[in-house]
A protein has these predicted regions:
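N-terminal strand-loop-strand
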Residues: 2-56
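Unchanged
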Residues: 60-153
Length: 153
């Protein structure tokens, strides 16, 4: 069962912190490994979003019954405005906050693609970033923590 939009909303965790996504959240880290190195497709959050102006991955609330990979791909479509057609599923990482989790789904694409000319309202800009440039960007704090845990920063 998947009720579209059913996961939208904040929840309060036992420690008093708030998280977006009543059933957790997920995002997709798109990776391309080529002769010129490893690249990641990132999105700069629009000023209409929490911590606007920072870089992260497309992602958001999971709907009731939605698997992390499905939610991550759906959010990519909503925020970037295009679908990922050719990819290989890589690792999936769960960041458990005690009753609420954020899932980072890593997928590999055979080639870098151009971002669409029109992006979703939550995204100010999207582009490919070389792995050695990740630490030079102003990253969304939780995304920075994830990259550190994954050994990418």
């Amino acid at each position: 069962m998947n009720l579209a939009g059913s996961g939208d909303g904040f929840i309060t965790l036992a420690d008093g912190s708030m998280r977006w996504g009543r059933y957790g959240a997920a995002g997709v880290l798109v990776r391309h490994v080529g002769d010129d190195g490893t690249w990641y497709f990132l999105a700069r959050r629009s000023l209409h979003c929490h911590r606007g102006g920072t870089w992260a991955i497309p992602g958001g609330a999971l709907d009731l019954g939605e698997e992390p990979i499905d939610g991550a791909l759906r959010e990519f479509g909503e925020e970037i405005g295009s679908q990922l057609d050719q990819f290989e599923l890589g690792e999936t990482h769960q960041d458990d906050h005690g009753g609420w989790s954020y899932w980072t789904v890593i997928i590999d694409v055979p080639q870098r693609f151009d971002p669409p000319a029109t992006l979703g309202w939550e995204t100010a800009e999207a582009r490919w970033v070389a792995d050695h440039e990740l630490g030079q960007l102003e990253l969304f704090d939780a995304f920075s923590s994830t990259l550190t845990r994954l050994g990418l920063l």
